[in-house]
Amino acid sequence: MKIALLSRSRKLYSSRRLIEAAEERGHEIQVIDVLRAYMNITSHKPSIHYKGEELEGFDVVIPRIGASVTFYGASVLRQFEMMGVYPLNESVAITRSRDKLRSLQLLSRKGIGMPVTGYASKPDDIKDVIKMVGGAPLVVKLLEGTQGIGVVLAETQKAAESVIEGFMGVKANILVQEYIKEANGADIRCFVIGGKVVASMKRQAPNGEFRSNLHRGGSAEVIRITPEERSTAVSAAKIMGLNVAGVDLLRSNHGPVVMEVNSSPGLRGIETATGKDIAGMIIEYIEKSGKVGKTKTRGKG
């Protein structure tokens, strides 16, 4: 197969591993920087150009699109879909999962466990927003934040009011969520491929920190998940429409709660913690499922 890997750099761990896995299995793979690709939006003959040449003959496209380039990256991916190239994750699923509020609304509609969450822009009554999610301590999140950036734990009522007022002052849209104290600063990353959890790890926040993101100094170790956690992760990925996803869960007193569904999960942490060849599993999934023209939306999303 001829595979297009949408990535800003072939030197990134996840990109490097996918290239290795594809080439080991005899596939041709080309790394394409989405920001350097440009498109011809023409009726009946959509095309993508890169470095002065038209991109042709691809069977599969693997999107590794960073959050900061979601809009343009999804546009390039959508163009591939319109050309009949099979996407590992479809553009509509990626944009859906990147919208934190939309994701939570979809998950709640299907009855997936989640922390009690409020959404606000300029609430008239901040105290009522805080009361709505059960009071302090609580977590305030920027809607557009990633890797733990823009996430604040407010431990008291006064702190919560100050944080919310501060975000409002810079005209930021925020999520206000209950703090799952019983999780003890740990979350579970479930790696889902093709409707199955193929690996899972526990990420633990360092002392004095509540965010367990590896980018923030958290540690990771392999963990055995429960059947309910497995089912929740698979369902969350399916609701988002993602073939490959990193589903982040917390263990709460009322069962597993989904914190985020990541459409472009990193491979370094999960491969290091579990010792599994996740990149190889992704390529194997593509070999079984990646048929030209087999795109549910054909770029209509």
From Swiss-Prot:
Mg(2+) 2 binds at E260, N262. GO terms for molecular function: ATP binding; metal ion binding; ribosomal S6-glutamic acid ligase activity. Its cofactor is Mg(2+); Mn(2+). GO terms for biological process: protein modification process; SOS response; translation. Mn(2+) 2 binds at E260, N262. Binds 2 magnesium or manganese ions per subunit. Mn(2+) 1 binds at D248, E260. It is an enzyme of class 6 (ligase). One of its GO terms (cellular component) is cytoplasm. Keywords: ATP-binding, Ligase, Magnesium, Manganese, Metal-binding, Nucleotide-binding, Protein biosynthesis. Belongs to the RimK family. This is Probable alpha-L-glutamate ligase. It comes from Methanococcoides burtonii (strain DSM 6242 / NBRC 107633 / OCM 468 / ACE-M). The gene is rimK.
